[in-house]
Amino acid sequence: MKQYDYKTISRTMLGDLHTPVSTYLKVRDIFPQSALMESSDYHGSENNRSFIALCPLASVSIDHGTAIFRLPDDSREEHPITDAYRVENALNDFRARFHVEGEYSNYCGLYGYTSFNAVRYFEDIPVKDSREATNDAPDMLYILYKYLIVFNDFKNEMLLLEMLQDGETSELDQVQKAIHNRNYTAYDFRAIGPTTSPLTDEEHKANIRRGIAHCLRGDVFQIVLSRRFEQRFTGDDFKLYRALRSINPSPYLFYFDFGGFRIFGSSPETHCRIEGRHAYIDPIAGTTKRTGDAEQDALNARYLHDDPKENAEHVMLVDLARNDLSRNCHDVKVDFYKETQYYSHVIHLVSRVSGTLREEADPIKAFIDTFPAGTLSGAPKVRAMQLISRLEPHNRGAYGGCIGFIGLNGSLNQAITIRTFVSRNGVLWFQAGGGIVAKSNDEYELQEVNNKLGALKKAIEMAEKM
């Protein structure tokens, strides 16, 4: 197994004249297949930096039962996923190929996504083949980038970071030159025709009633059923990302350009975060609409906090997060419980569950054992996913999976892929769902999906006017 050794070089710049968005606009045409990750709203010390990643060096993708390594010397390896060689083996083997030394090497790692479809590798879950060939993408894709631009949002500093092999000449000056460029190309965005869905309102309500029936029969306690929408467009979808981040600031803002397709969104929910030997899950369970009236929103938040159905769901999903972490952690506890958090169109109830990885535990396996989030599947999780695969007329693709960072040192920070667009060949796919329990009401659950999609639909309208 060949190992690739790198060292980091870096320089720090004053960042008060540069934002992540303006900088990305300057560098994206020079460095295609780049990524932007920001944080806003309810972020603290664990999430206070923004990143731009440029120039892919290597990648690991998993699709059709095979892990594909694309390596810095342009070589390619294929490794079938089997019971003896699982996804965590592939990710760990790929990470082990790279050794990075130097200051800020902790930022060097794999940036990308795990789609909901990846559940097929972790449990006995059938996944429908895509009926839209243009929406095909690997089940998992993570990229190691040569350059990182790191924004310290508290200090107004920019860090430029480059990974170099022995004998390689630095080109960090070219990155800095691009950042200082005052001109960049602007493109329009325009939606074409109406938004469509494979499901009508009545068909989705019928699905909800089927979910309620499964809860009443005792097949599941809760099941999360979703609905997909599609919108044709022309122009620059980055303008849509800008509109979405303005309308719906969230802890996880991201725009990934993977070449043939892009994934971008504004997610409020941490799927899993591992720092050192500490792991965290932040389940969101409980949603109500914002009205724009502060007094009414406060009343809605109090009703949400006290509603027996919402509380029962929240307790169930906090317990599921505890169980997920307990598979690889000890000292599992609830750090905060049922905190009310306000977003542009909705109010959420949020808790945090944490644990300490056992000495023998593998961080990647711990991450996989939490996938997918209970808040996007249900409880019991495996049975809920089996029913989701049967009831939803399409596979979920990126929706309900996760997106973010896997460090070469075993750290990771992954957001749940919700409030998100997938863009390919002039079509946007976006999706939302809600947790169904025995006492659910089909009309209310339909409205909850519409509430969650409110920010995305408003962003489309706003992007056309920018």
What residue ranges belong to the model's regions?
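Extended alpha-helical targeting/anchoring segments
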Residues: 1-466
